[in-house]
Amino acid sequence: MKSLILIAALLAGTYVWFNNGNHLSAPSGTEQQSFAGPSSFGQADSNRQVQSEGVVVKVLPDDNHGSRHQKFLLELSSGQTILIAHNIDLASRISPITEGDVVAFNGEYEWNEKGGVVHWTHRDPNGRHEAGWLKAGGRIYQ
């Protein structure tokens, strides 16, 4: 009898763990492109949730003004360079991250003349914005 209760408790705990998003996997049910995604983004994509991947070409210093952000530049397969601004007050930082690393991303794209920025690469604690994420080294950061 005690073993049945223990098994039921373990199953319930596992269910709660996975349904509260505490696991390290990509969100399910998203209608996004594959990690390869589009090879470039433009002004028409501004303010949209996008998903793709690129190679880290420069690791930048953290932005510690207001909400803290880990920042780095990714080069997409098209040659376009985009800035990733990953909120490390709401999500774990990618560590270590170095030039040449491949990083997949899901976040909100904002166009600018330099190629654009992707932010919202984390969950919204208030549940009002689509969750984003970064994937590097086989791990999801959100």
Regions found by a protein language model. Give the residues of each.
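OB-fold and OB-like single-stranded nucleic-acid-recognition modules
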Residues: K2-Q142
